[in-house]
Amino acid sequence: MEHFDVAIIGLGPAGSALARKLAGKMQVIALDKKHQCGTEGFSKPCGGLLAPDAQRSFIRDGLTLPVDVIANPQIFSVKTVDVAASLTRNYQRSYININRHAFDLWMKSLIPTSVEVYHDSLCRKIWREDDKWHVIFRADGWEQHITARYLVGADGANSMVRRHLYPDHQIRKYVAIQQWFAEKHPVPFYSCIFDNAITDCYSWSISKDGYFIFGGAYPMKDGQTRFTTLKEKMSAFQFQFGKAVKSEKCTVLFPSRWQDFVCGKDNAFLIGEAAGFISASSLEGISYALDSADILRSVLLKQPEKLNTAYWRATRKLRLKLFGKIVKSRCLTAPALRKWIMRSGMAHIPQLKD
């Protein structure tokens, strides 16, 4: 049975960043359900926008995005729609439009060969015994059993590691549904849509490489029905759909209280969305994935006396920032307040008409 310093479950942005930063400093194994390359297998349903905070993380790491990760076009504003109030406003935003699956594979490709990476793998079981974490996973057609001193859950909204550490922990979840259509709009755009009759979260659209992506986060019980109803409503706002080319769905976390942020225990750690580190106001998680990976890297390499306590303390600023997003979300999803803000014209950039 092979033993490692660190076992990382999941290689999204958080897991890939951590594996890269620990390479050569600790003995690391990393498991991921995505393939190493290509479009087959699992891909994360996501609008694919890189926020300024995520861009800053790449600046700190001295990384630049390859052209095959960047999508077309680059859009500098968000069209914000309040369906019930029939209001539309344009707000400046500095996102980078990316191909999310290509981005995830690129992040994995940066992991040095000193890290033992298993692609297209499935973690079957984890448990703690004799001060070690045991992991059973399936890869390359057979089951393997390894042990590790530290276990890292970077496995997203449905984190197996989080459920093992906190079996009674409850956090609000939504089903994120996206459909891809051939682009029909004369001018590509990115939108953020609020309709409290459909969801107390929000919906979105983005133009990307000749496609129009429409999606949103909806209650788990009847999400598909709500998604279809909203699509019908959006014709009044000149949204054009046609026949769906592709449909996607996944679970997304929606933190709504301080206790929703959990960092781990017993030499197991949670990073990224597995820890609840996702913005409640925008559902943006890449920047917090990168930041939490960097924080954990620092803790693991410094080796303080109580690592879990040190990681909890080190993420306090990040958790406070995310709690602020919870407050912001409550403001944005409050119909009267949102209507007042949009009607005020604050920060709105009117589009010139011919």
Swiss-Prot record:
Protein name (database record): Protein CbrA
Pfam families found in the cross-reference section: FAD_binding_3
PANTHER family from the UniProt entry: CONDITIONED MEDIUM FACTOR RECEPTOR 1 (PTHR42685:SF22), GERANYLGERANYL DIPHOSPHATE REDUCTASE (PTHR42685)
One GO MF term attached to the UniProt entry: FAD binding
Organism: Escherichia coli O139:H28 (strain E24377A / ETEC)
Transmembrane intervals: none
InterPro entries, per the entry: FAD-bd, FAD/NAD-bd_sf, Geranylgeranyl_reductase
Top-level taxonomic group: Bacteria
Family to which this protein belongs: Belongs to the CbrA family.
